[in-house]
C-alpha cells in the first residue's frame, strides 16, 4: 500500500470537504495501490455507492495532479486491502462465513428496555438527521446486514437514542421473538462487575452473546475501563460473527474518545458511522408542531417559530419549553400566543440571552477565523475580514434579542441596513458553499452549547 499517495489525497480532501462528510465517507476508506489502480476499500455498500457517486471523480483528479505521469485510476470495492498486517483481513474468512450460533437452548426472552413511544413515525426528520434516520431504517429492515455495526454520534438530545429505540421496536414488530436489548453502557459495566463479584461471568457472557440485537448507548462511558472494554470487545466480535446487529451511540466521533482502545475504535468503523447535528430552524419548528399534535396542544405557527428561533441546542430543550408553555396555559386558562410564550419562558430566555452576548459572539468568531475582535469592528473591507464580520452579525441576529440597529452599533457603529445585507449575504452563500455552511454550523454549535 502506498501511504504517501492516499495521505496526499486526504490532505487535499480535508481542505475541500466538511469534517462531518470526511468522517462519514472518506476516513472509513482503506487504500491499496495495485499496478495502475488505487483500490479504495469501503466498509459497506452504502459507503461505496456514496463515494462512487460523489467523490470518486475528484479523487481521480487528485491522483492525476499528484502523479501526473502514472495515469492512475480509482477502483472501489467492499472489504479490506489484501495486506497481511491488516487485522481485518485476518478476520475476513470469519466474517464471510459466520460462526454457528451456540447449540445450547435459547434463553428465555429478554426484557428489551425499549421505549414503545420511540418509533420512526414519531421521529421528525430534517437535514441534520436525514442520513442517520435512513441508515437506521435500513438496519431495521435488514438487521445484521451491511450496516453492522451502526454507530451514531452527536451531542446530547439530538435523537440518537430515539433512533436506536426505533430500530429495536421495528425489529420486535417484525419478529416478536427476537432477543433485542437496549441499555446504557454504564449498566453493561455494572452488570459485568456484579457478575465478577458473584463468579457468574460465564452466564453474563452467554446472556449478551445470545442476543439478536444489542443497542448500547453512550459508549464514551467505557473510556478508561480496561476490563469492561475487554469484555465488550469479545461480545461485539461474537455478535458480528453471528451476524447479529450492534448499534452504538456516542457524544463524539469514535476516534476522538480518549481512553478507548484502538482495537475497539477500529472495529466500530467496520460498519457505518453517522453524525447527527443540531436541528436547523425548520426541523425545530416541525419537532415542536409534531410534539404539540401528539399532546393535543393547539400551538400557533408564530409561537413555534418564536421558540425554535430562541432555543437551538437540542430536541430535549425544545420539548421542555413546550411542556412549560402548555403547563402554564393549563394553569392560567390563557390562550397560547407569542407574548404568553415569552412570559412562560422568561427565565429560560433570560439565561439564553445572558449566555450568548454580542461580545461573546465577536470573540468566538474572531478566534475561529484567527483574526482580532478589532478587525470585526474596523472599516477594513478585505474578504478575510468582511466574511467573518458578516458571519458574526448573522449569529448576533440569530442568537440574541438585540435589534438590527443595536447589532450594527456593536460592530463599529454600522447602520441596520449593513446588518440586514450581511444576514442576506451569508444565508445566500451558505446554500452553495459547503465550507461556509460548515463554519456556520460549527459556530452555532459552539455558541449554543
Curated annotation (Swiss-Prot):
- Provide the alphabetized UniProt keywords: ATP-binding, Cytoplasm, DNA replication, DNA-binding, Lipid-binding, Nucleotide-binding
Which intervals of the chain are annotated as region Domain IV, binds dsDNA?
Answer: 330-449
Q: A Pfam family name for this chain?
A: Bac_DnaA_C
Residues involved in ATP binding: 157, 159-161
Region of interest (Domain III, AAA+ region), ranges? 113-329
Q: Known Gene3D superfamilies for this protein?
A: 1.10.1750.10, 1.10.8.60, 3.30.300.180, P-loop containing nucleotide triphosphate hydrolases
Mention one GO molecular function.
ATP hydrolysis activity
Where in the cell is the protein located?
A: Cytoplasm
Residue ranges for the region (Domain I, interacts with DnaA modulators) are 1-83
Major place of localization? Answer: cytoplasm
Segment Disordered: which positions?
A: 77-114
Where is there biased composition of kind Low complexity?
89-99
InterPro entries in alphabetical order: AAA+_ATPase (IPR003593), Chromosome_initiator_DnaA (IPR001957), Chromosome_initiator_DnaA-like (IPR020591), Chromosome_initiator_DnaA_CS (IPR018312), DnaA_C (IPR013159), DnaA_dom (IPR013317), DnaA_N_dom (IPR024633), DnaA_N_sf (IPR038454)
GO biological process terms held by the UniProt record? DNA replication initiation; regulation of DNA replication
Q: Where is this region: Domain II?
A: 83-112
User: What is the superkingdom listed in this entry's lineage?
Assistant: Bacteria
A single GO CC term for this protein reads: cytoplasm
Spell out the subunit comment: Oligomerizes as a right-handed, spiral filament on DNA at oriC.
NCBIfam families per the UniProt record, alphabetical: DnaA (TIGR00362)
Q: Give the family, as the similarity comment puts it.
A: Belongs to the DnaA family.
> Domain note for this entry?
Domain I is involved in oligomerization and binding regulators, domain II is flexibile and of varying length in different bacteria, domain III forms the AAA+ region, while domain IV binds dsDNA.
What this chain does, per the entry, is described as:
Plays an essential role in the initiation and regulation of chromosomal replication. ATP-DnaA binds to the origin of replication (oriC) to initiate formation of the DNA replication initiation complex once per cell cycle. Binds the DnaA box (a 9 base pair repeat at the origin) and separates the double-stranded (ds)DNA. Forms a right-handed helical filament on oriC DNA; dsDNA binds to the exterior of the filament while single-stranded (ss)DNA is stabiized in the filament's interior.
> What protein am I looking at?
Chromosomal replication initiator protein DnaA
> Source gene?
dnaA
Amino acid at each position: 500500500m502506498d501511504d504517501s499517495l492516499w495521505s496526499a489525497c486526504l490532505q487535499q480532501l480535508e481542505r475541500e470537504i466538511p469534517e462531518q462528510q470526511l468522517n462519514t465517507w472518506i476516513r472509513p476508506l482503506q487504500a491499496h495501490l495495485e499496478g495502475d489502480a488505487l483500490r479504495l476499500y469501503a466498509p459497506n455498500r452504502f459507503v461505496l455507492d456514496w463515494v462512487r457517486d460523489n467523490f470518486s471523480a475528484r479523487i481521480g483528479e487528485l491522483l492525476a495532479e499528484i502523479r501526473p505521469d502514472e495515469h492512475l485510476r480509482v477502483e472501489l470495492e467492499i472489504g479490506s486491502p489484501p495486506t497481511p498486517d491488516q487485522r481485518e483481513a485476518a478476520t475476513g474468512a470469519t466474517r464471510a462465513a459466520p460462526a454457528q450460533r451456540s447449540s445450547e437452548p435459547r434463553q428465555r426472552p429478554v426484557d428489551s428496555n425499549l421505549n414503545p413511544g420511540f418509533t420512526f413515525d414519531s421521529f421528525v426528520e430534517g437535514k441534520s438527521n436525514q442520513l442517520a434516520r435512513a441508515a437506521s431504517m435500513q438496519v431495521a429492515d435488514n438487521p445484521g446486514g451491511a450496516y453492522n455495526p451502526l454507530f451514531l454520534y452527536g451531542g446530547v438530545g439530538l435523537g440518537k437514542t430515539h433512533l436506536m429505540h426505533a430500530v429495536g421496536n421495528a425489529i420486535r414488530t417484525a419478529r416478536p421473538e427476537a432477543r433485542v436489548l437496549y441499555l446504557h453502557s454504564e449498566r453493561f459495566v455494572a452488570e459485568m462487575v456484579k457478575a465478577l463479584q458473584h463468579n457468574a461471568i460465564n452466564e453474563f457472557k452467554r446472556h449478551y452473546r445470545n442476543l439478536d440485537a444489542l443497542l448500547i448507548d453512550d459508549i464514551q462511558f467505557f473510556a478508561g475501563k480496561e476490563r469492561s472494554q475487554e469484555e465488550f470487545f469479545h461480545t461485539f466480535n461474537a455478535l458480528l460473527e453471528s451476524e447479529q446487529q450492534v448499534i452504538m451511540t456516542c457524544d463524539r466521533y469514535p476516534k476522538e474518545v480518549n481512553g478507548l482502545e484502538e482495537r475497539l475504535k477500529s472495529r466500530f468503523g467496520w460498519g457505518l458511522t453517522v453524525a447527527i447535528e443540531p436541528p436547523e430552524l425548520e426541523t425545530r419548528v416541525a419537532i415542536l408542531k409534531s410534539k404539540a399534535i401528539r399532546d393535543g396542544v393547539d400551538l400557533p405557527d408564530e409561537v413555534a417559530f418564536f421558540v425554535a428561533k430562541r432555543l437551538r441546542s437540542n430536541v430535549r430543550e425544545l420539548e421542555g419549553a413546550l411542556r412549560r408553555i402548555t403547563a402554564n396555559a393549563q394553569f392560567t386558562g390563557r390562550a397560547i400566543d407569542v407574548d404568553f410564550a415569552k412570559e412562560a419562558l422568561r427565565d429560560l430566555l433570560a439565561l439564553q440571552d445572558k449566555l450568548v452576548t454580542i461580545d461573546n459572539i465577536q470573540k468566538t468568531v474572531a478566534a475561529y477565523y484567527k483574526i482580532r475582535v478589532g478587525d470585526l469592528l474596523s472599516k477594513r473591507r478585505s474578504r478575510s475580514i468582511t466574511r467573518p464580520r458578516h458571519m458574526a452579525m448573522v449569529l448576533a441576529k440569530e442568537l440574541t434579542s438585540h435589534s438590527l440597529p443595536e447589532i450594527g452599533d456593536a460592530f463599529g457603529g454600522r447602520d441596520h441596513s449593513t446588518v440586514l445585507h450581511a444576514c442576506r449575504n451569508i444565508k445566500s452563500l451558505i446554500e452553495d458553499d459547503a465550507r461556509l455552511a460548515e463554519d456556520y454550523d460549527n459556530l452555532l454549535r459552539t455558541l449554543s452549547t
